[in-house]
Amino acid sequence: MAHQAHSYHMVDPSPWPIFGATAALLTTSGLIMWFHYNSLYLLTLGLLSMFLVMIQWWRDIVRESTFQGHHTPTVQKGLRYGMILFITSEAFFFLGFFWAFFHSSLAPTPELGAQWPPTGINPLNPLEVPLLNTAILLASGVTVTWAHHSITESNRKQAIHALSLTIILGFYFTALQAMEYHEASFSIADGVYGSTFFVATGFHGLHVIIGSSFLTVCLLRLIKFHFTTNHHFGFEAAAWYWHFVDVIWLFLYMSIYWWGS
């Protein structure tokens, strides 16, 4: 930073935002093709493109922060504010799904049989797989906090152990959710109940996959000695995001699975 008289990071031009946006367009278009035409080609291309962009964008950020020293305290403060605002926007994103659910369930229309769950819908038992998933996510919240405390106390071995456990629990949750979707007696096409259930829980599941990927990158960085006791915002951001995913699941469980059944 000796060549400039301020502590801000002047970011170099990057191709990844436009490539990432293109990959997102391919992925969402691929989802439509999969839903309507049962074709996975475009979705596969979109996901592969997204994966490649993610790897290279993360590589650039790691290079700028860890090896070039661009992430000064001023930059880290800005990143913290950015992550807080991002998580706030995500909370409002999920608020829309909860609004749709309660709008439909608190005053069911005659088309739904004037009852909730609607006529013909056999809801999932909230005391079976959903309760197990709740326990898994709560346990993962404990392990990610354990990892954070281990990093701040310079206990690298425990940090790696705790973070590995968190990632395993995250992927276990995803596997159970996929199994639950496969065994559900209703689909996304089964009226407003199917739509709100699968869109809300599906987007939450997507956030779990994103969070698990985020934590996996943090684990690789931890193994490569990228984090210190006072410079590990990449991990902090991932932990904040993971706790947010936990809280959203608790609201989903209590409203859609438990109250809504």
From Swiss-Prot:
Q: Which InterPro entries match?
A: Cyt_c/ubiquinol_Oxase_su3, Cyt_c_oxase_su3_dom, Cyt_c_oxidase-like_su3, Cyt_c_oxidase_su3-like_sf, Cyt_c_oxidase_su3_a-hlx
Membrane topology, record value: Multi-pass membrane protein
**MF (Gene Ontology):** cytochrome-c oxidase activity
Tell me which EC number(s) this protein carries: 7.1.1.9
| Compartment(s) where it occurs, according to its Swiss-Prot or TrEMBL record | Mitochondrion inner membrane
Q: Which reaction does it catalyse?
A: 4 Fe(II)-[cytochrome c] + O2 + 8 H(+)(in) = 4 Fe(III)-[cytochrome c] + 2 H2O + 4 H(+)(out)
Listed name of the protein? Cytochrome c oxidase subunit 3
The organism's taxonomy opens as:
Eukaryota, Metazoa, Chordata, Craniata, Vertebrata
Q: Which gene encodes it?
A: MT-CO3
